[in-house]
Amino acid sequence: MKDNPPLFAGQVALVTGASHGIGAATARLLACLGATVAVNYHHDAGAAARVAEDIRAAGGRAVPFGANVTDAEAVGRLVTDATAALGPIDVLVLNAAGIVHPAKAPFLQMPQDVLERAVLAQLRAVTLPARAVGAAMAAAGAGSIVVVSSGLARDPQPGFVDVAVAKAAIEGAARALARELGPHGVRINVVAAGPTLTRATEWAGEEDFRRWASRTPLGRNASPGDVAGAVALLASPLARFCTGAYLPANGGVIMP
């Protein structure tokens, strides 16, 4: 049997929030599977450059692009620049959360504007790039978009109402966009990460990590690479008949 080409051979992928954590792991994995990767970052240019350098050192192709994906003009420039440098975008991974610091406060003590800002930031971080890239994908008649969400949307925990509501909003947006863009050949799916060992969970203590791990049948918390694998699966041609799908990468904490 002849060797099959890499899953993403000849494709360009844009990964938002790719300087650290799940985004960085996803960028590296997609590149390993043949994609040319646009590594988006907001603040940490050095970390994004290191991700791109790692990819190039392994024989792949990657370029970092700075942009705040909650800003429409910045997103427009990001997509224009990435397309000019790398070619039309075939895969869009919407990993940037837009929520820099979750409030981690009970709802009754959480200011209303904090909740509303979290929801708006997350919605903009998903819908602005999806609009900018989705238009070109629809015109081309093909494309794959994966939204990275959180298990908190369906299994909310005390103190995280801002994250739970924001993630539920983007999951609803993903389903709605899957309906609208499907006739144009564009697939949109959701990966919901369980507790993952990233900068976003640095606030947690050892007892928190043990408690989270104890809830999973697999007995451990996720690594960024665990979630990246689920993203790559849904983004790839292997999932060519999947759209509007919800894939939890949580070790079995939630079994929908």
What are these regions (language model features)?
Residues 12, 19-20:
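Conserved glycine-rich cofactor-binding loop
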Residues 33-50:
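Conserved glycine-rich Rossmann-like NAD(P)H-binding loop of the short-chain dehydrogenase/reductase
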Residues 76, 98-116, 159-162, 202-204:
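Conserved mid-core segment of classical short-chain dehydrogenase/reductases
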Residues 108-127, 142, 146, 170, ...:
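Catalytic Tyr-X3-Lys loop
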Residues 130, 166, 174:
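Active-site helix of classical SDR
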Residues 135, 179-183, 240:
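Alpha-helical segment proximal to the catalytic Tyr-Lys
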Residues 162, 183, 190-216, 226:
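A glycine/serine/threonine-rich, flexible loop-to-helix segment
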Residues 182, 187, 242-244, 250:
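Short, small/polar-rich loop/turn modules that mediate ligand/substrate recognition or access, typified
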